[in-house]
Structure formats: C-alpha cells, structure tokens
Regions:
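Disulfide-rich extracellular domains of secreted proteins
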Residues: 20-363, 395
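Short beta-strand elements of extracellular/lumenal beta-sandwich folds
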Residues: 380-410
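Proline- and Ser/Thr-rich low-complexity, intrinsically disordered segments
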Residues: 20, 522-597
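Bacterial Sec-dependent N-terminal signal peptides
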Residues: 1-22, 530, 539
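Extracellular/luminal low-complexity Ser/Thr/Pro-rich, glycosylation-prone repeat/linker regions
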Residues: 342-377, 421, 471-532, 593
C-alpha cells in the first residue's frame, strides 16, 4: 500500500464518508506476574506467479501489483489456507503456566475482492472466524471479537472506491486451549484476498499469538496488552499511554515491547516507532523502517515458522528488548511510558501493542494441606471417615522483590464440613479476624513484618470436622471436599491501587511454586444409608418436590403409601398423593446420592 494521495477540494465531499475511523488503543490485559511474554505469528498470503506459495519468499517486492496466493501448510484437504509458527518451551527450573493468551488475525482487502473473489469467496460475514490448532491436535473453530472492521477505505491510490484498501482485525482469547507453552501453532481458513491487486493499494493478511506466562524463576514484570486500530500516516499518529506500574528503584530498567501491524513495507522507508519521544531500532528493524513486513524476536528475524519468509508482504509482528542503555528511555521509579508509531512517508495500520517492564512487586504464595488427628498428611486421601476431625495447615510467604502489606487470607468452608472451626493456631503477627457462620468464611490478617520480600514460610492451622448429618450431603460430589484459600494484598513500593490477589496450591513444588488448585480429600461413605430427608406438606391438590441441582440423572420412585413405583426422571417431580418419595441422583465420577421426601 502506498502513500495517501492529496484530494481536490471538489472531491472531498464524496470521499469523506468513507474515511476510516480509528479505534483508540485501550488496555485489554494488565497484570504483574513473575514471568514473561512471547509473541509469534505468520502471514497467510505469499507471492505466487511461477513459484509455490508455500515456499519462503525472501525478495524485496511490496504487496501491490503482484499475484498473491494462499499459503497452506497443514496437509489438510479440508482447509483452504494455513500457516504455522513454533514456540520453544522456555527453559526454567520452575513450573510454568499460561496466564493469558490471545490470537489476533487481520487483513487488508478491497471491496472488489468481496464482490468478485471465488473459490473461496471473501466473505465479510466470516471475517471473525478462523481455525486454530496446537501441535498435532484437532482444529478449534474460533469466533473472534471484532477489534476493527469499519468497512471504510483506509488508503487509496485512485478514485475507484471498490479498489480502495480496507482492513479488519479480530481477536480470540485462547488461554484455555493452551496446556503448555512450547508447541507448533497453526491458523487456517482465514478470510483473506488473493490474486493480483493492480491499483497499487495492495493485499496483506496474517495472524499473531501473544502468550503471557508465569515462571517463578523470573523477575516480576508488569505486562500490559493493548489493541485498537490506527491509520498512521504523515502528521497522523497515536500516542499510547501506559501506567499502573513502577520500575525498579535502582539498577538497569528492563522492558520489552510487542506489536503487530498491517501494511508496513520492506522497501518503503519512513515508518518508525518512538518510545517516550525517542526513535528506536531493534534487531531486524531499522530505525527508519521499523515496520518492514517481518516477524522478529529479541535477536532478530524469527524464522521458526512455516512458511519462513523474511518478507511477509505487508504483515508485521514481533517483540524486542527496549534499548535502554543508562536508563535513558525509561528511568528508575518510572510510573508511565508512551508508545508512538508514526511515519514520514508510508502509511500503515498498527492494531496491537504490548508493554512488558520489570517492576518491583510482592508475590505471595500459599500452600494448603490436610492432616488427621495423628498429624498424618491426608491430602488427596480417599478414605476419610464420616464425621472425622481434621486440620487444615496453610503456609505462606512473599517471594517477590517488594514488601507486602494489607495481606488478608480468606478461607470458605464447604458445606460438607461442620459449620465451625476449632483450635486456631497462628504465628505472632497473624490475627484471626472472624468466622462468619452465615457465609462460612474465616479471615486472617497478616502484619507486614511477616511478608517482607523473600520472607520465610509462616503457618496458620485450624481444626475442622467432616459433617455427620446426612442432610449436609445433598450436592453433587459432596464427598469430594475441595476448597482453596485466597488472599488479597498490596505492595509497599508498588503503586498498583487495585492490589494483588492469589489462590493456594495443594503443594509447593520447585521454586516454592504450584498451580493454583483446590486442596482435596474424599469421604468414603455409602450414601445408601445416608439420604437427605425433607418433609413436604400436601396442603393443596399438588406438591412440588425439587432435588438438588447439578446431577446427570434423576430417578424418582414412590416407596410407601398408595401407588408405589417409578414416578419420573427429571429434577422436579409434581405429586398429588401423600407417601414416601425417593430420588436417586447420579453424576459421572461422583458418589450416587439420595433424597427422601
């Protein structure tokens, strides 16, 4: 895509109705994590003509007036285009987990392609749909959130509006699809134009994946993800302000920037990136041609892709370390920064930025285990007796680089435990605040002296008792007693006003880390002889009996009084005759339970 042409005044009235409206860049995600972020991606279009579209293109042509064809690398006849990118598993001595992952896909197209493209058609109604797979797994059909699809002309080299360049951007939250970090990620069936665009506006299409992950061996980083859409051209560019962090108080300030954009050209210079007002360069990205149709990482071109073209013909994505020698761009104790894409010649369309800066922040970790009266660890045990006395032990410490304050630890007892706590033991500096019998919530407050940076483990413990009243055992899987401890806290130096939250894990692993999950034990009880019982008075012609929700199946039968036998298979049973009614409730993986009315 080339520079905007100047318009004659008498044409302005007819053109202004199609001028693109920018979407302001706003934070999508902001969190302080001990970890980092990864950005990869690929184009879905490649130079065709006499060469295979799956062959890497390393030439210097721009994306106009050439034949653009779909790449299709997945060896799957059911998809019409595809490309992939590899992510290497980060090396660490600690456990890692994905905190957040987003997939973006974007294209520059023309109305002429929407009207005339065939096999397959370019369908606006399907812009928000792609296929996404991890490794050798099956494709997931994604429906994205629209970031930009105004159907406006964003650039033109002539007066034919059907050939004016338009653009779309969509994203999807794919966090729950990623079980690991390292994998080959493939995107397919992305709506994109193909063929030869002869007006000079050009076609472009590609995708990028951003992964934010926790790794307790790494420093605390405040990571902010932004998306929006801007037509950047000479004299017209956005300033993206970032706040909600505080850099380290001394020593080097380390930051990383991520981005994705359409229409940066390898051969058209002048598109640049400023950080806090200073033009920057990065490995693989010249200061005077920062957006240059490439995928890069901290060391330069990222070719762990298929196809592995060095020229992606109008699609850019990457991540780089901020060149901050002597903290000249980002100072100690800084709390704001500004990212500014701009140009003196080419026009291009950034739609994603990420800001990742090492900060000072506390990090509370909590381990929760279960013990019997003989002080045996019975976490995950499957033979706990009805009415057994047990003890929860909660350990906590601060592994961050900032002191913590205002730490409040909260436990909510499940209904399968008696509504009381006993024998509460806390270290000096921890206060048992309250136990609310209505909400079954127990709270502890912790003095900041116990949670200074890199503090030692502290332990809270209290007694609980497994319920011994059959009417306390009504819900699905009630005999699988699982719950977590949660905590809220603030940093002493970290300025985040919303503070921090965390949940417990069942066992501290490497680096005092773990995956947040409930602590579990199972009560071994035959519920045939322990049914929930309730008396319902038949005052009118009918009475409604309602069993507990959440089971897979229900089987009602009348066991005494009048017409006995099976009565229904729904959760709710309407009866018109006095007697005894029993419902058998089943759920896969859980004990069979009963109710009697």
């Amino acid at each position: 895509m080339k520079k905007f042409i100047l318009l004659q005044c008498f044409f302005l009235a007819t053109i202004v109705t199609t001028v693109a409206q920018d979407i302001p860049f706003t934070p999508l995600f902001q969190q302080t994590v001990k970890g980092d972020m990864i950005i990869v991606g690929n184009a879905i279009l490649n130079k065709g003509d006499s060469r295979p579209a799956n062959a890497p293109y390393n030439g210097d042509h721009d994306n106009s007036r050439i034949n653009m064809e779909y790449t299709d690398v997945d060896n799957d006849l059911s998809t019409f285009n595809s490309s992939s990118a590899d992510v290497k598993e980060p090396v660490s001595t600690c456990n890692k987990r994905v905190i957040k992952a987003y997939l973006y896909w974007a294209a520059a197209y023309t109305q002429e392609r929407v009207d005339n493209q065939r096999n397959p058609r370019l369908e606006r109604s399907k812009f928000g749909q792609v296929k996404f797979k991890i490794g050798n797994g099956a494709y997931h059909n994604l429906v994205g959130h629209k970031v930009y699809d105004g159907n406006h002309i964003v650039s033109s080299t002539g007066w034919d509006q059907n050939k004016g360049q338009r653009a779309y951007v969509y994203r999807a939250d794919v966090t729950n699809l990623l079980t690991n970090i390292g994998a080959t990620y493939t995107v397919a069936d992305m709506q994109a134009p193909f063929g030869t665009e002869d007006s000079g506006a050009g076609y472009a299409a590609g995708w990028n994946l951003v992964i934010v992950y926790e790794d307790l061996a790494r420093e605390s980083r405040n990571i902010t993800l932004f998306d929006g859409f801007s037509v950047v051209r000479s004299g017209r560019y956005p300033d993206i302000s970032i706040s909600g962090f505080k850099t380290v108080p001394s020593g080097p300030v380390k930051a990383r920037i991520g981005f994705a954009a359409l229409e940066g050209e390898i051969g058209i210079y002048g598109d640049k990136l400023r950080i806090n007002g200073t033009e920057i360069s990065a490995p693989g990205r010249n200061q005077n041609n920062f957006f240059n149709s490439s995928i890069t990482n901290e060391t330069g071109a990222n070719l762990d892709r298929n196809p592995k073209s060095t020229n992606l013909l109008g699609f850019d994505a990457g991540i780089f370390n901020l060149p901050n020698n002597g903290n000249n761009l980002l100072h100690n104790n800084a709390t704001t920064a500004t990212i500014s894409p701009y140009t003196v010649q080419d026009s291009y369309y950034p739609f994603f930025f990420a800001f990742n800066v090492e900060v000072i922040a506390p990090h509370i970790v909590m381990e929760k285990r279960v013990y019997d009266v003989a002080n045996n660890d019975v976490t995950n045990a499957t033979n706990i007796a009805f009415g057994a006395s047990l003890r929860y032990k909660i350990r906590f410490r601060n592994t961050g680089n900032d002191d913590a304050k205002n730490l409040v630890i909260t436990e909510v007892l499940p209904n399968s435990l008696q509504n009381k706590v006993t024998s509460i033991n806390v270290p000096s500096g921890v206060t048992f605040t309250s136990y609310n019998t209505n909400t079954r919530e127990i709270k502890f407050t912790v003095d900041k002296s116990l949670v200074k940076r890199n503090s030692t483990w502290q332990e809270i413990s209290f007694g609980v008792q497994v319920a011994n009243n059959c009417n306390d055992w009504r819900d699905p899987c009630a005999n699988q007693i699982a719950n977590s401890v949660s905590a809220t806290y603030n940093g002493v130096e970290n300025p985040t006003s919303d503070g921090f939250t965390t949940k417990s894990f069942p066992q501290a692993g490497s680096c005092d880390s773990g995956t947040a999950a409930p602590t579990l034990f199972t009560v071994n009880t035959d519920f045939t002889n322990c049914a929930y019982k309730e008396t319902v008075t038949l005052c009118q012609a009918n009475a409604v009996l309602t069993a507990a929700d959440g089971f897979d199946s229900y089987k009602w039968e009348k066991t005494a009084g009048g017409n006995i036998g099976q009565k229904g298979t729904n959760r709710v049973l309407t009866v018109s005759e006095a007697g005894t009614y029993k419902v058998t409730k089943t759920k896969a993986g859980c004990a069979t339970m009963y109710e009697i009315y």
